[in-house]
Amino acid sequence: MLREALRIGNRRWYSYKSVRRPNLGATGTPKMEPPKEQPEASSKAESGHGSLAKQLRAKILSTGPIPVAEYMREVLTNPQAGYYMNRDVFGREGDFITSPEISQIFGELVGIWLVSEWRKMGSPSPFQLVELGPGRGTLARDVLKVLTKFKQDAEFSMHMVEVSPFLSKAQAQRFCYSHQTLPEDAQLPHYQEGTTASGTKAFWHRRLEDVPQGFSLVLAHEFFDALPVHKLQLVDGKWQEVLIDVASSDGAQEASFRYVLSRSQTPVSSLYRPLPGETRSCLEHSLETERQVGLLAERIERDGGIALIMDYGHFGEKTDTFRAFKQHKLHDPLVEPGSADLTADVDFKLVRHIAETRGNVHCCGPVEQGLFLQRMQGEARLEQLLAHALPENQEIIRSGYEMLTDPAQMGTRFKFLAMFPGVLAAHLDKYPVVGFS
């Protein structure tokens, strides 16, 4: 499959023309195709930051300190002032940039990986391409190109799991020929639908549970790092939860927050049970990650399919990773809530443990992003693009791929983990999963 996809010759198999992605070293600001709604939405978001801080302050003063997870959820997804809800936060002009935005090679190789493993499973049809938290839709668009080219006679549909009305429209503009938002009283499992230029149907859902049953190829790129985490600390042999309180209660207009240690057991600290071999005295634990991974595992066991999780993270050794990013720089997560992205590294040890205990699922990885892309013949694809690129674009293409694979940049920090039906374990041992071995 890889040789077929990466063949270089007169027919230029799979040699789409290079796409001009942002030059990260340039002093000028590249155009990133912002959705038309951006100016109005951005203004709305800016005006909401102060009100969100006041809402959080009022809640804390009335009910007491809140878990970091509750703070994180409210800051990111508050319907009126949540960070993701009303504006474009991606790219050079946003607060962070993701791998698919840096280089088309990323999405193309992910697409080739999906096709390769799908074919090894017998090319079931119809199937679903599902993405959790699709961002701008760049990864979905790049993978769509690959699937459309190599799906043979198979039929498939696209299903995006997205809570942000703003981002769902941006995604539809990215890869759909036409799209529409459905009435609120439609009583359907999706709230938006569209059709791509190649005729593929696309649907938007607010929850993974709303995606129809069926064989699915599931992508989760920088999805789990945005899920709320609880911060726990071991004190005198007992786990206590780190909470967020107001810095003062004197009625000051300027809302300010601080971390405090719970005075007594919270529901999370009382129920938390560390994984075998746990040695940390402080850690971050995501109940929402447990829930989402459990849903994925149950779906794969029941319906068949593959899930590929791509995110920055660790294997159960890090302690304090909760942080904020604003305009590509670290930012205090307790200052101006709603104005910056909140994130925490994914605990891949927890992800793998939940997947393998909640369902009959076989996991591969995690492996480092740089290693995965190299094993997927990323250098060969890079040379293809360079050979057909304009001279002024060659350094942009080369530096983008270097950023994805360089150990000092994104190559080791980002990890890939794959989930397969457990019944395929022996088959996958005999025919190793490309990119993971």
UniProtKB/Swiss-Prot annotation:
The keyword Zinc-finger does not apply. Residues 21-49 are annotated as: Disordered. GO terms for biological process: methylation; mitochondrial respiratory chain complex I assembly. It is found in: Mitochondrion. Arginine methyltransferase involved in the assembly or stability of mitochondrial NADH:ubiquinone oxidoreductase complex (complex I). It catalyses: L-arginyl-[protein] + 2 S-adenosyl-L-methionine = N(omega),N(omega)'-dimethyl-L-arginyl-[protein] + 2 S-adenosyl-L-homocysteine + 2 H(+). GO terms for molecular function: protein-arginine omega-N symmetric methyltransferase activity. GO terms for cellular component: mitochondrion. The keyword Transferase applies. Its EC number is 2.1.1.320. Transmembrane segments: none annotated. It comes from the Eukaryota. This is Protein arginine methyltransferase NDUFAF7 homolog, mitochondrial. Keywords: Methyltransferase, Mitochondrion, Transferase. It is an enzyme of class 2 (transferase). PANTHER family: PROTEIN ARGININE METHYLTRANSFERASE NDUFAF7, MITOCHONDRIAL. Belongs to the NDUFAF7 family. Pfam families: Methyltransf_28. Coiled coil: none annotated. It comes from Drosophila melanogaster. InterPro entries: NDUFAF7, NDUFAF7_sf, SAM-dependent_MTases_sf.
